[in-house]
Amino acid sequence: MKKAIIIEDETIISFGYRLQLESLGYDVLGTARSSEEAETLLNEVQPDIIIMDVYLKGDKTGLQLAQEIHARQQIPVLFLTASTKPDIVTAIRQLKGCHYLTKPINSDSLEDVLVRFAQN
């Protein structure tokens, strides 16, 4: 079973992602609401994929956190964001091992991206 963590500052949205991931056969190892919680969680678990928002509570954005994660380990990151700002989209595309979907998230789109990540 594939393992995931969710890094999202909105609890209800995080819960929805958990349900979607579990319905696709993922084991959700934990959730974090801030960059600091995410760092703690990543020291405790080893996910196969990270589902993350671009904008987080705490000192770091999702983009900064992804860069730090990839400096230590190559865990794919799927950004789920409402932002369509060109600079954000460009920054995500420049990060190796990252992809994004725009909120609201369609279950089929989520599944397609997760399948592509699993194949790589």
Q: Where are the regions a protein language model picked out?
A:
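Conserved acidic carboxylate
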Residues: 8
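Acidic catalytic/metal-coordinating carboxylates
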Residues: 34, 60-64
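Short amphipathic alpha-helix used as the core "switch/output" element in two-component signaling
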Residues: 63-72
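Hydrophobic/aromatic residues positioned on beta-strands within the core alpha/beta folds
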Residues: 80-81
